[in-house]
Amino acid sequence: MDLARSMADSKKSVLVVDTDMRKSVLVGRLRAKVESGGKIYGLSHYLSGQVSLDKVVYATNIKGVFILFAGHEVPNPTELLETKEFKELIEFGEKNFDYVLVDTPPTGAAIDAAVVGKNVDGAVIVAAQNVTSSRAIINTKRTLEDSGVKILGAVLNKCRFEESKYGHYYGNYYGNYYGRDDDEK
């Protein structure tokens, strides 16, 4: 969500699509403006034909950021992501928003990221510092590339600079630099 927030801060509109229909965590993290009688519909509802696309996109408490939650858990999320409705959703996002960010489950847990990757411009591999092994990152990269997905880059998140051998240097340098008065720079 930090990436979506940064894009929105640049006056861009962003649609975040949560495709983790097995174990989503985004619905609990964001406050969506719900207008559908209190019920939050999501991707699984749309892809299974229960609701139309206009019923699943919600504004968030972040100006310019909209969300399409995963919806309820389903036994066949990969099959749903392979439907023409998912492709139509991506096309809708491209036409109506400056950016479409698609959040997928970890590739070690499911093949969903490779399926989604075929319908988007590319993938950004996100790894957690001191959690994600280098082997898992290499396997993820290989899985995506073998599926024809273009790798756009990588993000290391959950960083604790005080635990990093370089964090002390960068933290002190930039902290001191930005902490000085303009005439001292």
Over which residues does each language-model region extend?
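P-loop NTP-binding module
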Residues: 1-185
